[in-house]
Structure formats: C-alpha cells, structure tokens
C-alpha cells in the first residue's frame, strides 16, 4: 500500500508541470459568514522562487489593439481585443511577465481569484483538447476580464464565451464576486464549462479537481456551455438512463489514485475544520458534500487558518510529524512552494474603498503574515512592485521568502518563533484595523479625500511595520541558526584545538 501511495505522489509531481498547479480554494456565502460578508480564500502554489508584485492598473480611454500574452512572455499566443474604455483594477502578478494575476478587484467592485488547476478525463480531451497554442489560460484571465466586467455574472458569461470560441489553454476554476453574488466557474474540456452560484448560507471548497456536480439548464443559479450535457452523452461519460441526474464532475473530471493523496485530503480537512461533526475518510472524495452549512459562522480568521493548514497535530503533519512513514503521504494546503495566499472579503454595506479588502500572505502561509490591502489604496511602500526569480534585498516578496527558507532548515525549532510573533502582530492589527475603519467612516461622510488619505497612511504604515518585524525575525532566526551551526561544527572537531 505504501508503495502505491508513494508511486501516486511521484506520478502527480511529474504531471504538475509549471503552472499554478496545486491551489486550494474556499468560497463562503454571506449568510454563512459571521458578519454578512462574502469570503473567498485561495492559495497559489507553483515554485517558491516565483516572486510576486502588487500592481494597480489605471483606467484607460479610447484603446485600440489587442491584449497579447506572447508580448508579455506569457504562457502562449492568446490574444483578445482591448476594451475601448477599461476600468481601473488591481492584481498581484508574476514579477517576470506582470501577468498571471492571482487576485484583484476593479473599480466597479467586482473581483476574481484564479485559477484552480483542474484536470479533465483523458478520453474527453482526445475529442475536445485544450487549445494550448492560443487558448485562454490563467496568465490572461484577470487582465482580460477585470477591466471590463461590471458584475460577477458578466465575468462568468464573458469567460464562458472565450472558452467556447477560442478555447481553454488548460483546465481551470475561477471565482467571481461582486456586491450581490459569488460564482465559481470550472472548465470541462477545451471548449466546455459550467458555473454555479454559491448558496448564500453555505461554503464550497475545492483542491485541484472539478468539484461542481449539479448543472441545470435554464436555471438562473447555473451557467454553462450550451451542449455541455449532450457532449458527455455523445462521448459516453454520461448515460441519463443509468446515471440519473447529470453530474458535471463525474462526467468530465479525471478521478484516480492521484486524487486520493493529493486532492481529496485537503477538501476533507477543510470540511472537518468547519463541520467537526462530519466524519469522512480522506479516500472518499467523490462522496464529499459539494456545499455545506458550517456548524458556526465563518470569519476571515477561519479562512486564514485553513490556508495555513498542514494536518496540524496529526501523524500526517507535513512538517512536525515524528512519523516518517506518514508525514508526507498527503499533500497539505500550506506548502513551501505557495507564492501567495489570500482571503477576499466583500462587505457591500461599506464604501468600495474599504468594503473590498484582500488579506494577503506572501510565500508559505504557515510562516507568513496576512495583511489587509484595501481597494482604496493608491500605492504601496518600496519593494512591492519590485522582484524577480532571483533573491534580492529590495523585493517585498523576498523579504518574507528569505525568512521562510531559514525556518524550514529546522521547522520544529524555528517555526514557533515566527508563528508566535506573526500571531501577535495580526491580533494587534485587528484592533487597529477596527479603529481605523471607524475613523474612516466618520471622515468619509464629511470629506472623502481626507478619508482616502487616512486609508493610505494606515495601510502603508502596517506594510512597513510587518516588513520591519520580518527583518527582525530573519535576524533572530539567522542568529539561532548560526549558533546551531557553530555547535554542530565544533562537535565534529571534538577533542581538537581549532
């Protein structure tokens, strides 16, 4: 059994290539949250050296020409017309291409998070393959949709039209959110897709596998390619007489032994966090509920905790377990190669400037700090727009990544130092944040410009404080590591005089 598990891990690693392949996504309806906000959490996992930059894209007027992925050294040769008048929007993007924005909002208050890499059945891809040469990929989704979509539903519709006409260059899931609705979009094959509106009183979690089951044509809670059911019937992955109600995941998504160790456990773990009374086995992934009502209303803190999870306190803990046979069997949510994770929060009752906020942890969430980035921000402190795949002394990404790399040389010894300091920082920040938002709203009613100035001053101050703390922690861990190395090398020369 152990040999089969290890073989499946090796096989999955080989398949996972170079895109943002191993993400985990959580969506929470407004009536399932503790304050009436809609929440989205996602980790972006690929390569630890993939530095990120924070970008604010200004509004544009009278544009002509084409968006070109290739022109930015993107994934392929996908092109799409630029919007004549494009809205201002934000992204956290790849430092090299400035594409592949993991998360962002536009000036209409509409946001997206993407993508979740998913895999279709091989037999269907032979009939309707991905358009790897010129189809849309995660590199281009944010920069094509955010400047033009005025609602979550419009974003779903537009992406669906692109997939049906130009094709998907890969399999993906994308979150769309606005003041009223929360949608999740999944590709099936190169030109097939569906999307589902998230129930207000439930949450949804997915991990590198198609998870949407129900799809009903002409139902306002669903959208999809016009022949998505017929295609499955024609290609014998769905038989209405035998299978009953159409199940998109069962009809389109790959499901094999790799999912048992790589994908199912993450979904199961999150559901066990939010519904402790639910008893499930990691291996029963196809039986996991798609949507669930949490046993207690969920908060931003709950989603942060989920993004930091690594089977904590069990024999399967990827970093702290003493059981070498079990510690690396199941893929955790928080992994070292995560280059950023985020929690989006939409509070429609507040002005968009503070009502749309994204909490971002750069690098490995378990060893990072979540800071709130409000949509009213007009800029960042030094280092946020800098970076490359080579470590430097300027990029904010490398400020956090250097500390995480040091800690992972001896996780058990060094991680408590970092985690305790960041937990204290976040707790104190929550108090400051509540006070700031109260002051902002009082000012906003009298003078919006002064309120926005306050927002930017507050935000940049906490960016700097977190950066300073991280430098302090890096020096502290480096000092500890130096002392440990000194003791280790002295022991090698025991009885000798250096």
Located regions from the model:
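Histidine-centered catalytic/metal-binding microenvironments
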Residues: 418-498
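Substrate-recognition/cap regions that form aromatic- and gly/pro-loop-enriched pockets
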Residues: 316-445
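A contiguous strand-loop segment
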Residues: 23-138, 158-285, 289, 294-295
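Short, charged, surface-exposed loops that flank catalytic or proteolytic processing sites
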Residues: 148-154
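Bacterial N-terminal signal peptides that target proteins for export
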Residues: 1-8
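Sec/Tat signal peptide C-region and signal peptidase I cleavage site
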Residues: 17-22
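Short, well-structured alpha-helical segments that form the helix of a local strand-helix-strand
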Residues: 155-164, 303-307
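Accessory, solvent-exposed terminal regions and/or long lumenal/extracellular loops of proteins
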Residues: 260-327, 331-336, 425, 430-445
């Amino acid at each position: 059994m152990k040999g089969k598990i290890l073989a499946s891990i090796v096989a999955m690693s080989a398949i996972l290539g170079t895109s943002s392949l191993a993400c985990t996504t959580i969506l929470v309806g407004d009536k399932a949250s503790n304050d009436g906000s809609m929440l989205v959490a996602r980790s972006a996992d690929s390569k630890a050296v993939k530095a990120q930059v924070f970008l604010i894209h200004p509004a544009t007027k009278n544009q002509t020409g084409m968006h070109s992925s290739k022109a930015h050294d993107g994934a392929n040769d996908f092109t799409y017309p630029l919007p004549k008048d494009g809205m201002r929007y934000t992204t956290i993007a790849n430092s090299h291409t400035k594409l592949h924005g993991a998360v962002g909002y536009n000036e209409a208050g509409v946001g997206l998070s993407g993508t979740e890499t998913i895999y279709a059945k091989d037999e269907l891809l032979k009939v309707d393959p991905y358009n790897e040469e010129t189809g849309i990929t995660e590199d281009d989704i944010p920069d094509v949709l955010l400047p033009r979509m005025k609602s979550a539903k419009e974003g779903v519709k537009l992406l669906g039209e692109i997939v049906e006409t130009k094709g998907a260059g890969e399999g993906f899931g994308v979150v769309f959110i606005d003041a009223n609705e929360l949608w999740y979009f999944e590709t099936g094959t190169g030109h097939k897709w569906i999307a589902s509106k998230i129930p207000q009183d439930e949450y949804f979690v997915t991990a590198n596998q198609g998870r949407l089951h129900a799809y009903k044509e002409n139902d306002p809670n669903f959208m999809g390619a016009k022949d998505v059911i017929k295609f499955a019937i024609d290609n014998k992955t769905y038989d209405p007489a035998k299978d009953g109600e159409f199940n998109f995941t069962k009809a389109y998504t790959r499901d094999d032994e790799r999912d048992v160790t790589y994908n199912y456990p993450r979904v199961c773990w999150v559901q066990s966090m939010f519904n402790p009374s639910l008893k499930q086995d990691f291996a029963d992934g196809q039986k996991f509920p798609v949507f669930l009502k949490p046993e207690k209303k969920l908060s931003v803190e709950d989603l942060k905790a989920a993004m930091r999870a690594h089977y904590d306190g069990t024999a399967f803990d990827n970093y702290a377990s003493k059981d070498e046979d079990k510690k690396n069997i199941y893929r955790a949510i928080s992994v070292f190669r995560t280059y950023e994770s985020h929690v989006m929060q939409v509070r429609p009752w507040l002005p968009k400037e503070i009502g749309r906020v994204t909490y971002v942890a750069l690098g490995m969430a378990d060893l990072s700090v979540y800071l709130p980035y409000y949509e009213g921000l007009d800029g960042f402190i030094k280092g946020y727009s800098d970076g490359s795949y080579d470590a430097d002394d300027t990029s904010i990404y490398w400020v956090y990544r250097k500390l995480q790399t040091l800690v992972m040389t001896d996780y058990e010894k060094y991680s408590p130092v970092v985690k305790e300091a960041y937990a204290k920082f976040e707790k104190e920040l929550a108090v400051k944040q509540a006070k700031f938002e109260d002051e902002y709203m009082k000012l906003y009613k009298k003078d919006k410009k002064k309120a926005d100035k306050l927002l930017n001053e507050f935000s940049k101050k906490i960016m700097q404080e977190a950066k300073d703390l991280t430098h302090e922690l890096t020096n502290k861990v480096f000092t500890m590591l130096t002392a440990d190395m000194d003791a280790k090398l002295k022991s090698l020369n025991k009885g000798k005089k250096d």
